[in-house]
């Protein structure tokens, strides 16, 4: 209570690694993708049960992977990826679906946007703080509606939004808070 001059410092995204890439997949319609830990608390069935056109991809690993692979054989589970391989795979998506109801901030949202991929999520803390309707994605209590609306969002708009969260921008913001101009 005796603190003064407090300023938030945003998390950043590596916009050199996570950036738009050439499409190397030729799927059947749009690709809806989740990336992250494959665990119960991520609420993945809320995404995987959706009736969506095209394909569903899950990038990642975790304790629920085996069960979900058996339950959803039509879903493409890539397994864990990292670095360039992760960034290229993510950039193939047409929409990034974030079904979690409990994450306070998902860096994966920024990574998707930096890749030019709009986000579909529930309007809960975390996504609500960073997703702007029609600018970089869509929020809705009906995740299917959010995903379908996100398909119409400009990839360039997502990229422009994410550029404000590059590590360069976040570092300058942090340094300016330490030593104001």
Where do the language-model regions lie?
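Nucleotide-activated donor-binding/catalytic signature segment of Leloir-type glycosyltransferases, i.e.
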Residues: 65-84
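Short alpha-helical donor nucleotide-sugar binding micro-motif in glycosyltransferases
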Residues: 80-81, 88-93, 174
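A charged, aromatic-enriched C-terminal amphipathic alpha-helix characteristic of glycosyltransferases
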Residues: 151-180
């Amino acid at each position: 209570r005796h603190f003064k001059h407090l300023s938030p410092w945003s998390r950043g995204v590596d916009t050199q690694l996570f950036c738009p890439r050439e499409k190397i997949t030729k799927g059947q319609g749009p690709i809806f993708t989740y990336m992250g830990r494959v665990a119960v608390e991520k609420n993945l069935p809320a995404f995987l049960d959706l009736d969506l056109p095209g394909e569903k991809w899950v990038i990642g690993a975790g304790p629920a992977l085996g069960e979900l692979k058996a339950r959803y054989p039509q879903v493409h589970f890539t397994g864990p990826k990292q670095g360039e391989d992760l960034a290229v795979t993510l950039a193939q998506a047409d929409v990034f679906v974030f079904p979690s109801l409990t994450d306070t901030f998902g860096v994966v949202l920024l990574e998707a946007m930096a890749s030019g991929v709009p986000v579909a999520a529930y309007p809960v803390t975390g996504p609500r703080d960073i997703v702007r309707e029609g600018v970089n994605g869509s929020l809705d209590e009906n995740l299917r509606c959010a995903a379908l609306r996100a398909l119409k969002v400009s990839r360039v708009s997502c990229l422009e939004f994410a550029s404000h969260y590059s590590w360069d921008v976040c570092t300058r913001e942090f340094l300016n808070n330490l030593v104001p101009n």
